[in-house]
Structure formats: structure tokens, C-alpha cells
């Protein structure tokens, strides 16, 4: 099943088949917090080869490990791409149906960076860094 999404202004659209999803979760790192403007960022990791994009996103090198894509018109953050090209993490809230069961977060990463005043009361696995628990 195809999962589609877009930036706020609609200038950039994307889609990916559900079979290309590699994982979902919440990121508590300071970069995701600043760029999303929220205390946590919900992400969906996908195989980069499976992502179809219409429109031309702008790129921003957010760390020594990778870059972010965003809409040059409305500024919506679209995805993070590590330099090794092994995956992309799309913002879960950018999908047309962010409540689709396949997009439900399954893990917390960078939990050691979580803001002390913010807590999500769930039983999902938590990783203190960017590694996936059990991975």
C-alpha cells in the first residue's frame, strides 16, 4: 500500500510503499527538536530507493553525519538522510494520514537527550543514543 505525504504548501509531495518502511519512532535529539520546533520528532525510516518525490526540496547539512530536506517555499522539514545512504527518516506528521497503523512509533531514540519536562507515557523501548534497541 502506498503512503503519501506533502509539505505544508503542497509544493513537494512524496510517496513510499508500506513494504519499504524500515522502522518508526520518536527522536529526542537536540537537532530534531530544534528543526521540528517540538520536544520530540516522530519519524518513519524508509529505503531511500523506494521514495518517490515530486518537487525540488532544499537541503541543509544539519550535522557531520547527514543532511535534511525541507520545502524552500514553506519551510516544512521533510526528511533526514545520513551520508551512508542506508535509509531516510521522513517526518511522520508529513504523511497525508499520519495515524495510519504502519506509521505508529515503535521506539524512542536519543532518550538520554529527552527534555526533563517532557514525558511520553508508553511502554516502547528506549535507546539512550541513536542505536535501535535490540539492533
Regions found by a protein language model. Give the residues of each.
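A short Gly-Trp-Pro
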Residues: 1-135
Amino acid at each position: 500500500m502506498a503512503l503519501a505525504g506533502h509539505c505544508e504548501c503542497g509544493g513537494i509531495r512524496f510517496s513510499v510503499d508500506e513494504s519499504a518502511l524500515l522502522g518508526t519512532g520518536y527522536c529526542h535529539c537536540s537537532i530534531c527538536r530544534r528543526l521540528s520546533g517540538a520536544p520530540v520528532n516522530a519519524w518513519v525510516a524508509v529505503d531511500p530507493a523506494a521514495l518517490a518525490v515530486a518537487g525540488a526540496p532544499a537541503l541543509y547539512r544539519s550535522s557531520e553525519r547527514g543532511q535534511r530536506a525541507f520545502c524552500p517555499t514553506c519551510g516544512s522539514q521533510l526528511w533526514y538522510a545520513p551520508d551512508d545512504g542506508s535509509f531516510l527518516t521522513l517526518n511522520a506528521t508529513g504523511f497525508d494520514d499520519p495515524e495510519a497503523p504502519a506509521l505508529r512509533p515503535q521506539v524512542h531514540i536519543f532518550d538520554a537527550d529527552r527534555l526533563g519536562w517532557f514525558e511520553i507515557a508508553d511502554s516502547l523501548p528506549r535507546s539512550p543514543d541513536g542505536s535501535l534497541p535490540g539492533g
